Amino acid sequence: MDIFLVVLVLLTIIAISNIVNRFVPFIPVPLIQVALGIIAASFPQGLHFELNTELFFVLFIAPLLFNDGKRTPRAELWNLRAPILLLALGLVFATVIVGGYTIHWMIPSIPLAAAFGLAAILSPTDVVAVSALSGRVKMPKGILRLLEGEGLMNDASGLVAFKFAIAAAVTGAFSLAQAAFSFVLISAGGLLSGVVISFLIIRFRLFLRRLGMQDVTMHMLIQILTPFVIYLAAEEIGVSGILAVVAGGITHAVEQDRLESTMVKLQIVSSSTWNIILFILNGLVFVILGAQIPDVVSVIFNDTAFNNMMVIGYIIVITLTLMILRFLWVLFFWNGKWFFNKDQSIYKPGLRSTLLISVSGVRGAVTLAGSFSIPYVLSDGSPFPERNLILFLAAGVIMCTLVLATIVLPILTDKPEDNVKEKKVKLLTARRKLIKAALTAIKENMNETNKTASFAVIAEYNEKMKNLRFQQFTVKNRTKKDERKVRAQGIQAEQEELLRLIERGDIPEETADSLQERFDELEVLYTNPFKVGLSKKKLKRLMYWIFFGEQKKPEMTILNEEGLIRATRVKTAKAAIESLKKHMTEENKDVTLAVISFYNHLIFRLGHSYHEQNPSRRFENQKLEIKLRAVQAIRNEIQTLFEEREISRDMSHELRQYINDVEAAMLDGDE
């Protein structure tokens, strides 16, 4: 029961972290998850559990790296093989040597072998954290692929170096020749075992298909089990399980098209299932990381043998050492003409890109999990020297690199003046995708009962799709902000005209309330970019219709009410046109004329639609329900585009405002 409660709390924290990210999108989700994990573990009765290193690697790291190996473009990795090896192998060993001597010089109480071990476990970068952070900023494609390739390889090299350093610290014996031979054997064996085991699994799946066993559920289960089987088998024979799952992922990617091209349903189910699994695993990694930090920190802060400010200073010095070494390594080795030829296909970063690569070296879960595997005692039975301090330093460096990357990466990558045209193209493409998502949602929920209303809404969205390109040119001389301001002025003029009609007694109270409610919704949508423009009254009416059915009224009463509302709206629209003409200046002329054109179109539509159709309240409620589903589909699509890095954070905000514009237009047409 305790394990179940811990898992339930962890999953709840993941859900909360994504909700929080919607309100503070400038903070990456991993950092929020780490913070929530820290908070959950800070209370005496909070989230406390011992991190099992072996279980952590097989349960989390194996499937995550398998998926990364499967999804990372192989051709781009091959083109970047030299710089990837430079970072994943060369920089790791340089970090072990330079970092080890620096740590031992700064903290003599940590033996040199243990210092090498700490430097080794600090050398791997966290590919999960890098992917999450890069989703918030626009990184050059070459740098992103380089960081992904580095993250796939350096976990293994760092852990192998860590293993030998800790073994030397425990036993007091070390052989460089033996360590080098073992490293080659473990690495090559891991890659080879991953390829062989993956090939056998693929052949097994083909064999099942030849037997006619093409059940999607069974094949999906084999896919899910694959990374665990590869990792455990590789570790059992004494080679690198991490490199094995990476090689296994790449092997599966090579065979994927041939194996699954005829199983379209499996591809769809596989994509959806893995997205859910990866979402949960990524979140759990960072929440668990945060949950371990309070216990690690409290041990050092409560120990009178340590000066708290001094140990924090150690963390800062180690972090800066890692960053500077990474910067110099990339700068000198990349710009060395003796190393790279002038092949333009090889990405060669400048100073800015070098800084990006340096700051993107975020440490994460592998570092903390590896440090927890340090034994408590040496071979002679004495306590491992400064084990608690080593854990504290590892946790501190993880937090420093994560926070530093969060702050610095947007500064280094945000160059809006260089991407204006690209942004316009992306926004136009994204808007088309949003409308397509809405149309898909409408068609999926269409049935015999709501078919007429569905076709009506589909027609509206098709019209929007056709007008997108026209809108791109008509709004080029005005900003959306100015347009919303003028539209808000028009709504205000309509409200004033409505008050005059009420004072003269030209319209009944129920009609006035209905129109005032609509004007309030439109005003909110044009002035508040983050508020949903659905009133409580309308929502209540919709829910009543969904659960209890429509409120019966005589057909003639309904027609009279609809006709009166339309006639009144024509009057308020004409009043808005007159008001906008009076306030039109040279500065806002283009915007004002566009809004006046909108009102003229509205008047024309209101005057004709009443004679062409006799809408019932049921029909209108059906349309409202369909539109709400479509709007939600659009919001989901925006989040998907953001998570898949097709749009930036700023573009997602702009598109969410675009949703409000669409919703306002729908409410205007919902007469």
Curated annotation (Swiss-Prot):
<keyword id="KW-0406">Ion transport</keyword>
<feature type="transmembrane region" description="Helical">
    <location>
        <begin position="314"/>
        <end position="334"/>
    </location>
</feature>
<keyword id="KW-0452">Lithium</keyword>
<dbReference type="GO" id="GO:0098719">
    <property type="term" value="P:sodium ion import across plasma membrane"/>
</dbReference>
<dbReference type="InterPro" id="IPR006153">
    <property type="entry name" value="Cation/H_exchanger_TM"/>
</dbReference>
<dbReference type="GO" id="GO:0005886">
    <property type="term" value="C:plasma membrane"/>
</dbReference>
<dbReference type="GO" id="GO:0035091">
    <property type="term" value="F:phosphatidylinositol binding"/>
</dbReference>
<keyword id="KW-1133">Transmembrane helix</keyword>
<comment type="similarity">
    <text>Belongs to the monovalent cation:proton antiporter 1 (CPA1) transporter (TC 2.A.36) family. Nhak (TC 2.A.36.3.2) subfamily.</text>
</comment>
<dbReference type="GO" id="GO:0043130">
    <property type="term" value="F:ubiquitin binding"/>
</dbReference>
<dbReference type="Pfam" id="PF00999">
    <property type="entry name" value="Na_H_Exchanger"/>
</dbReference>
<feature type="transmembrane region" description="Helical">
    <location>
        <begin position="355"/>
        <end position="375"/>
    </location>
</feature>
<dbReference type="GO" id="GO:0015385">
    <property type="term" value="F:sodium:proton antiporter activity"/>
</dbReference>
<keyword id="KW-0472">Membrane</keyword>
<dbReference type="InterPro" id="IPR004705">
    <property type="entry name" value="Cation/H_exchanger_CPA1_bac"/>
</dbReference>
<keyword id="KW-0915">Sodium</keyword>
<feature type="transmembrane region" description="Helical">
    <location>
        <begin position="83"/>
        <end position="103"/>
    </location>
</feature>
<dbReference type="GO" id="GO:0051453">
    <property type="term" value="P:regulation of intracellular pH"/>
</dbReference>
<keyword id="KW-0630">Potassium</keyword>
<dbReference type="InterPro" id="IPR002014">
    <property type="entry name" value="VHS_dom"/>
</dbReference>
<feature type="transmembrane region" description="Helical">
    <location>
        <begin position="228"/>
        <end position="248"/>
    </location>
</feature>
<keyword id="KW-0812">Transmembrane</keyword>
<feature type="transmembrane region" description="Helical">
    <location>
        <begin position="276"/>
        <end position="296"/>
    </location>
</feature>
<feature type="transmembrane region" description="Helical">
    <location>
        <begin position="389"/>
        <end position="409"/>
    </location>
</feature>
<feature type="transmembrane region" description="Helical">
    <location>
        <begin position="156"/>
        <end position="176"/>
    </location>
</feature>
<keyword id="KW-0739">Sodium transport</keyword>
<dbReference type="GO" id="GO:0015386">
    <property type="term" value="F:potassium:proton antiporter activity"/>
</dbReference>
<feature type="transmembrane region" description="Helical">
    <location>
        <begin position="46"/>
        <end position="66"/>
    </location>
</feature>
<feature type="transmembrane region" description="Helical">
    <location>
        <begin position="182"/>
        <end position="202"/>
    </location>
</feature>
<feature type="transmembrane region" description="Helical">
    <location>
        <begin position="110"/>
        <end position="130"/>
    </location>
</feature>
<comment type="function">
    <text>Transporter involved in the efflux of sodium, potassium, lithium and rubidium.</text>
</comment>
<dbReference type="InterPro" id="IPR018422">
    <property type="entry name" value="Cation/H_exchanger_CPA1"/>
</dbReference>
<feature type="transmembrane region" description="Helical">
    <location>
        <begin position="5"/>
        <end position="27"/>
    </location>
</feature>
<keyword id="KW-0813">Transport</keyword>
<keyword id="KW-1003">Cell membrane</keyword>
<protein>
    <recommendedName>
        <fullName>Sodium, potassium, lithium and rubidium/H(+) antiporter</fullName>
    </recommendedName>
</protein>
<keyword id="KW-0633">Potassium transport</keyword>
